[in-house]
Amino acid sequence: MFTLPERRRAARARASVSCALLSIAALAPALASADDVESGWNHDFYEARTLVSDGSVPADFPDGNLKNGWGVAFNPQGFVWVADNGTGKATLYDGTGKPNPLVVAIPPAPGETAGTPTGIVFSGGADFITNGTTPTGAPLSGPARFIFATEGGQISGWAPNVNTATAFVMVDNSHGGGAEHAIYKGLALGGGGTTHLLYAADFHHSRVDVFDGAFKPVTLPAGAFTDRHLPRGYAPFGIQAINGDLFVTFAKQDKAAEDEIAGRGFGFVDVFDPNGKLVQRFAERGVLNAPWGVAIAPSSYGRFGGAILIGNFGDGTLNAYGPITGHFLGSLRDGHGRRIRVDGLWGMQFGNGLLQQPTNSLFVAAGPNGEEGGTYSVINAVSR
């Protein structure tokens, strides 16, 4: 049987160095090394602002439910949703960071006191029917609008016509909390022909599990989502659907294959088609450091407009790559040329254009202070 504190203890110990980082900032000039500072950023740069926090760091709005903010997903017609790994909740915000009254509970797996959501996706179709109970206890079913993966090995759906207060487990690979449970660190929604498919990154077993629109397992060709040129000990960590393909980030496993090992150069990013066929080794080593979040920047996002942005959980930096070649273009930096660092960086998505959530603003969630805290922030391109 496992518990969240046991699984994350090593990660928190590794992240204890985060006291040297601000929750969202570049290093102070007196502490910055030559490698951290780059000239030519005084007119075209990026600016970060912490919109929400659990109170552990200054922010525009407080929210005690926001601890270890992980996945980020936008309702195309509404608020952003953030998966709160540390509280087993999902919380909603507008573009200023103002919390929405709706707070959704994510069910715990056996051995957990609360759910441990990681990846989250929005689903707007009629599939992914979720079975649950109404607030009065009556059974009811309906299509999930948001779907969550958890470190406990479960996938849950939230169907608003069933129960707005909680999601319901639709895939259970927790194995009763045993040692062989899946540990889903990321989730993506993609397609195979005319169908929708869920892709869950199982870090523990070094694989990507795939489910159809009925939450049933899908068998892909042998060797799907594998890269024989990866070093041993690397496993799927984050996953993001972009332009019909799946970007999969790989992080180095600890001895228990439960958590990532941070370190400069500890990371790879591959691109696969919906059937799991390797298309491209997109990025490797270099500045990668336990990479998790992936987003494609709009053309209006400053000097890195149109680039693929990859966020490092390991050191909190955000790095840009050419969308076709994967050539490293540089790191997001502030007006002093210092790398922007988001302590405990996880999910990153551009806004939906509604509720003060611009399509050229990058919204990010994080678990600062060794994943004990939580933040939701925005990073904008600035020209002057």
Question: Which positions does each model-derived feature cover?
Answer:
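N-terminal secretory signal peptides that target proteins for export/translocation
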Residues: 1-13
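Exposed, low-complexity/repetitive linear segments and helix-based recognition motifs
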Residues: 3, 32-33
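Intrinsically disordered, low-complexity, hydrophilic segments
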Residues: 8, 28, 36-37
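Intrinsically disordered, low-complexity segments enriched in polar/charged small residues
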Residues: 12-19, 279
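Bacterial N-terminal signal peptides
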Residues: 16-29
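Sequence/structural signature of beta-propeller domains
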Residues: 33-384
